[in-house]
Amino acid sequence: MTQTIFITGASTGLGRATALLFAQKGWKVIATMRSPDKETELGKVPGITVMGLDVTNPAQIAETAKAALALGPIDVLFNNAGYGLAGAFEGATDAQLVNQLNTNLLGVMRVTQAFLPGLRTQGYGTILTTTSIGGLVAFPFNSVYHATKWGLEGWSESLAFELEPFGLKVKTIAPGGIATDFASRSLVFTTHPAYMDAIAKTMAAFADPERRSNGSSAEQVADAVYAAVMDDADKITYVAGEDAKANYTQRLAVGIDKFRAGIKQMFLG
């Protein structure tokens, strides 16, 4: 029987690469995005159905979930939509805070709630959420983004206990740097004059060519997504990318405080 994956944030980057990979593997793919009218390629791929979905719109979430479930059982719900809010926390506007939480955290929760009755009734399925290495470690000037990603990791770990009796699995994929247009299309900056020098140092460290060379392509992380979906192990978090694996391994090995000292030296000097 053909399996189906529902993907949020499928217009670019990891979401798009995952949609193409699963379609290639013979899955039915429901690829969602805020502006489906601008998508001219995915809908032509055999097995891919494109739908509109803004994860900050509860009414549209309910409508899209109903339409997707009407097509048949959903084997995998892949919560992938998100963006980064970077810069000084003090400079963040209330609108920026609300938008970040609505998209990265509440959006995931609302989409999952919309699908849970169907998933629970069918008695099988996987809820997979893109977090980030930023959900396991922290870097300077990403505090609100980290709050959402750490929140998703904790939410997923707790939710797994609730849903296991119903045959449902809960997993996260935590990638490091991805060579995509995330930085240009999916990054919003706060501004505050008191932090400009420190922010400049941090951004320079993030942009360092040697550091960026350790990142992954969207296709490589999509492979990790597929592996996580197919894995039967009793495991929640799947760290993806050599840079992310190195960071997380080091944090576990040296402890939180020594790891923080290393991050401070790397990004702030």
Residue ranges and their predicted role:
Residues 11-12:
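Conserved glycine-rich cofactor-binding loop
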Residues 53-63, 94:
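The beta1-alpha1 cofactor-binding region of Rossmann-like NAD(H)/NADP(H)-dependent oxidoreductases
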Residues 88-89, 96-98:
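Substrate-binding pocket helix/loop in short-chain dehydrogenase/reductase
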Residues 90, 137-144:
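Active-site loop immediately N-terminal to the catalytic Tyr-X3-Lys motif
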Residues 112, 148:
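Active-site helix of classical SDR
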Residues 132:
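Residue(s) in the substrate-gating loop at a strand-loop-helix junction
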Residues 165-235:
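SDR active-site lid
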